[in-house]
Structure formats: C-alpha cells, structure tokens
Amino acid sequence: EAYIKRLEELEAIAKDQPGVVEAHAFQAGREVRVVLQAEDTTDAQAWDASRAIAKEVEERLTFPGEIKVTVVREVKAETLAR
C-alpha cells in the first residue's frame, strides 16, 4: 500500500506542473516520465519542468537513493498516402 501511495505521489507532483499531459512512475518509484503538450511548451520549459519536478520531489518525499525525472516534449505528424 505504501508502494502504491509513493507512485501516486510522484505522479501527482509531476501533474502539478503547467503543460503536463501525462505522468507515469516506473521502476518501483525510481523514475517518473512526464509528457508535455508540445504545442504549448518550449524545449527550455521542458528543462525547467524537469528541474522543478525533481526539486518538488526532494522537498515533499522521503526516499533512499535517486529518482530520475524524464520530461518528453514531442511532435508527431501523420499523413496517409493513398
């Protein structure tokens, strides 16, 4: 139960950042991956978000070792050829 709560807390911290579409905790809470809205954010904002999330995790959670924060900002373009 504590394990699930920790994962949910990690995801909640990440989702509090502006522009976040998705956040998922992995690796027994050792990593959190965050997806930003590509249209509304810049590369610099992605870096800022990763630092802000890491800082918030350090301040709000107690954990042994490290937690890796990965922020993804991508654009997908799809077209059908017929």
Task: Tell me the role of every PLM-derived stretch.
Residues 1-30:
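Divalent metal-dependent catalytic cores for phosphoryl transfer on phosphate-bearing substrates
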Residues 20-23, 62-66:
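Intrinsically disordered or highly flexible coil/loop and linker segments, enriched in small
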